[in-house]
Amino acid sequence: MSTFVAKDGTQIYFKDWGSGKPVLFSHGWLLDADMWEYQMEYLSSRGYRTIAFDRRGFGRSDQPWTGNDYDTFADDIAQLIEHLDLKEVTLVGFSMGGGDVARYIARHGSARVAGLVLLGAVTPLFGQKPDYPQGVPLDVFARFKTELLKDRAQFISDFNAPFYGINKGQVVSQGVQTQTLQIALLASLKATVDCVTAFAETDFRPDMAKIDVPTLVIHGDGDQIVPFETTGKVAAELIKGAELKVYKDAPHGFAVTHAQQLNEDLLAFLKR
């Protein structure tokens, strides 16, 4: 099993497929590197090296009590990039993982980065703030934490419906829903709850100004988890030269529901 050891001793799992120009994937909340298997197989079969890791506290990585914050997540990515000596890497972040890769560029620069892709990402700001009243009300996130601490398995099981848009007519197999629950339950409860605080409260607006590589923003306008109008749309406006693609009626989990469209768009961006 491929792992590296972070600066604080946390062991972090990653998978590394294929050869060619590298693409590094950062997963969403409740998930792990396995969420990317269809994108990784597609791109690695077409001449790219694809790498995905389990964020600390999730999947097969260690479960430290502390360090579940975006500066640490970004530093973990920096260490993985250095560990593998990646150059001209394209960073792809989904949901809270979009914050990981944006913060990486803000903290560590873009010398090793060829491009950035933000998929249904929480950037530039997910939660409400006095100067960002359009953000998601903080009591929504407080409820998430309360329900997770009461019955995590049921919360995640119920979360599948809005995540995949099943409650809006999207068709997702029972197998995928079961896999999502299984992946989510591998994670540390502490990390799962801490990450709610991280993605609800972290302001990435300063990070957006530091992004100086070609950027593709993809978001579904049917996203019930991370609303397009206050995240993806704004991020594309704040990042200089960003390209925006909006998937009509797509849910938050469009990497599953719109996998072929996403794969083709990723490949086109890599070939630009």
Swiss-Prot record:
Outcome when changing L30P: Shows faster acetyl-enzyme formation. Tenfold more efficient at hydrolysis than perhydrolysis with methyl acetate as substrate. 3-fold decrease in catalytic efficiency for hydrolase activity with methyl acetate as substrate
Family of this protein: Belongs to the AB hydrolase superfamily. Bacterial non-heme haloperoxidase / perhydrolase family.
UniProt keyword terms in alphabetical order: Hydrolase, Oxidoreductase, Peroxidase
Protein name per the record: Arylesterase
Naturally occurring in which organism (per UniProt): Pseudomonas fluorescens
Source domain of life: Bacteria
Effect of L30I: 125-fold increase in catalytic efficiency for perhydrolase activity with acetic acid as substrate. 2-fold decrease in catalytic efficiency for perhydrolase activity with ethyl acetate as substrate
Catalysed conversion reaction: a phenyl acetate + H2O = a phenol + acetate + H(+); peracetic acid + H2O = acetate + H2O2 + H(+); a percarboxylic acid + H2O = a carboxylate + H2O2 + H(+)
Further information: It is unlikely that perhydrolysis is the natural function of perhydrolases. Instead, perhydrolysis is probably an accidental (promiscuous) activity. Perhydrolysis is an important reaction that makes peroxycarboxylic acids, which are useful oxidants in organic chemistry, for lignin removal and pulp bleaching and for disinfecting wastewater and disinfecting equipment for food and medical applications. Perhydrolases were previously known as metal-free haloperoxidases.
Enzyme Commission number(s) of this protein: 3.1.1.2, 1.-.-.-
Protein's UniProt keywords contain Hydrolase: yes
Subunit record text: Dimer of trimers.
Domain AB hydrolase-1 residue range list: 21-253
Activity over temperature: Optimum temperature is 70 degrees Celsius for esterase activity.
Amino acids binding acetate: W29, M96
Effect of M96T: 4-fold decrease in esterase activity. Loss of perhydrolase activity
Task of the protein: Hydrolyzes phenolic esters, such as phenyl acetate, nitrophenyl acetate and naphtyl acetate. Can act on a wide range of esters, but reaction rate and enantioselectivity differ significantly depending on the substrate. Shows a preference for esters with small acyl groups. Also shows low perhydrolase activity, and catalyzes the reversible formation of peroxycarboxylic acids from carboxylic acids and hydrogen peroxide. In vitro, enzyme-generated peracetic acid oxidizes bromide ion to bromonium, which reacts with monochlorodimedone to form bromochlorodimedone.
InterPro entries recorded: AB_hydrolase, AB_hydrolase_1, AB_hydrolase_fold, Epox_hydrolase-like
Biophysicochemical property: pH dependence: Optimum pH is above 9.0 for esterase activity.
GO molecular function, one term: peroxidase activity
Positions of the catalytic residues: S95, D223, H252
